[in-house]
């Protein structure tokens, strides 16, 4: 099975280490353009753009990067309860047209009650999912060209319609991740691709089976994806040393404060991430080559695959054997790590690579000329 590999745009910040300004770098448009262009050239299928008050706006970032990329797709957030589903449908169609069919959408219900209250959304966990189901039903039908009347508990529209359709027909694909029963019910009814964070394979297999069964009960099939960090090096020893180095500036107080902040979330997925490490740094390898160190201070995706190219590829294939065809990777810092993943991991996987753009120059990778005259010796990529 060919795998669809995405990268990640760190609009919330980037650097060499977690939890410190040491080695940090400014994440401006120039830097984001570098990462997007690298992902575009290296063969990543798309980039996930995060959402929330700690991030730059994902829609504006995506729109700004359309002109500087050629094939890269942009996975941006839909926020039920924060924006009207009909307005979101118009925005989605416009982004799809402006990008010539390179827009993808990620339904994000939110998991931080404090942040949601600041955005004017005062619904509990169950109510948010009720509203998200209503939002998605309207959004999908409007994008597909229907004139929609809808009278729900949380949302009501009359005569909602779209005059300018998207490029992708009947509409751009919808992605979504969530671990609660309500989230799985939503995925089974509404989305094309269900995402999970990087839990151990047995836990992921259980979630996939549950969503697959619920989707089948509605006569639907759902694809599956996973969100993971990657620390890949030429040797396993180098990779584990890089993992240790990434959290080398973290102290116990920083970890404790981060975990206390994340504990207020009512997201089941976030609770499952936190349970993998328990806020302790002594047992971070929670499954073979699956390292939970990132989650000590980072919300959301908190695990990384660690190892050399063949080792990480073997772990990726374990997830693929469960039915996952889409992998959304990231690594710190994101520019350099995009190259490492492409150079050290891609050769060991069957990756769906977008067609390379035509160029007037010699773009085959061959290194630097020897003595200004001799082509370097070729090395097999297998």
Curated annotation (Swiss-Prot):
Catalytic activity, reaction form: an alkanesulfonate + FMNH2 + O2 = an aldehyde + FMN + sulfite + H2O + 2 H(+)
UniProt EC number: 1.14.14.5
Matches recorded under Pfam families: Bac_luciferase
Keywords linked to the UniProt accession: Flavoprotein, FMN, Monooxygenase, Oxidoreductase
Matching SUPFAM superfamilies: Bacterial luciferase-like (SSF51679)
GO molecular function annotation: alkanesulfonate monooxygenase activity
GO biological process: alkanesulfonate catabolic process
Entry's family note: Belongs to the SsuD family.
Protein purpose: Catalyzes the desulfonation of aliphatic sulfonates.
Protein name: Alkanesulfonate monooxygenase
Species per Swiss-Prot/TrEMBL record: Pseudomonas entomophila (strain L48)
């Amino acid at each position: 099975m060919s795998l669809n590999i995405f990268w990640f745009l760190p609009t919330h910040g980037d650097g060499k280490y977690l939890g410190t300004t040491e080695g940090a770098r400014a994440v401006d448009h120039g830097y984001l353009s570098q990462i997007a262009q690298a992902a575009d050239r290296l063969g990543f299928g798309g980039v996930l753009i995060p959402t929330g008050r700690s991030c730059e706006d994902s829609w504006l970032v995506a729109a700004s990067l359309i002109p500087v990329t050629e094939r890269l797709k942009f996975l941006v957030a839909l926020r039920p309860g924060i924006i009207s589903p009909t307005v979101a449908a118009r925005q989605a169609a416009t982004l799809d047209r402006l990008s010539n069919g390179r827009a993808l959408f990620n339904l994000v219900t939110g998991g931080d009650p404090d942040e949601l209250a600041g955005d004017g959304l005062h619904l509990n966990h169950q109510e948010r999912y009720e509203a998200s189901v209503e939002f998605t039903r309207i959004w999908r039908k409007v994008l597909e060209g229907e004139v929609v009347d809808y009278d729900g508990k949380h949302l009501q529209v009359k005569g909602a319609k779209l005059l300018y359709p998207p490029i992708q027909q009947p509409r751009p694909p919808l992605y979504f991740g969530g671990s609660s029963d309500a989230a799985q019910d939503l995925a089974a009814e509404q989305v094309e691709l269900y995402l999970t964070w990087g839990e151990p394979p047995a836990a992921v297999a259980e979630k996939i089976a549950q969503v697959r069964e619920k989707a089948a009960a509605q006569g639907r099939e759902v694809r599956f994806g996973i969100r993971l960090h990657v620390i890949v090096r030429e040797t396993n020893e180098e990779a584990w040393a890089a993992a240790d180095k990434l959290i080398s500036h973290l102290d116990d107080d920083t970890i404790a404060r981060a975990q206390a902040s994340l504990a207020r979330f009512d997201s089941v997925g976030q609770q499952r991430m936190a349970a993998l490490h328990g806020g302790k740094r002594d047992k971070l390898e929670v499954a073979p080559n699956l390292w939970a160190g990132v989650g000590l201070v980072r919300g959301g995706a908190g695990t990384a695959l660690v190892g050399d190219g063949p080792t990480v590829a073997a772990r990726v294939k374990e997830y693929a054997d469960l039915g996952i065809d889409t992998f959304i990777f990231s690594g710190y810092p994101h520019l350099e790590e995009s190259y490492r993943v492409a150079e050290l991991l891609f050769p060991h996987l069957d990756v769906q690579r977008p067609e390379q753009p035509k160029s007037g120059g010699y773009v085959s990778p061959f290194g630097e000329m020897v003595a200004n005259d001799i082509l370097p010796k070729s090395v097999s990529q297998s």
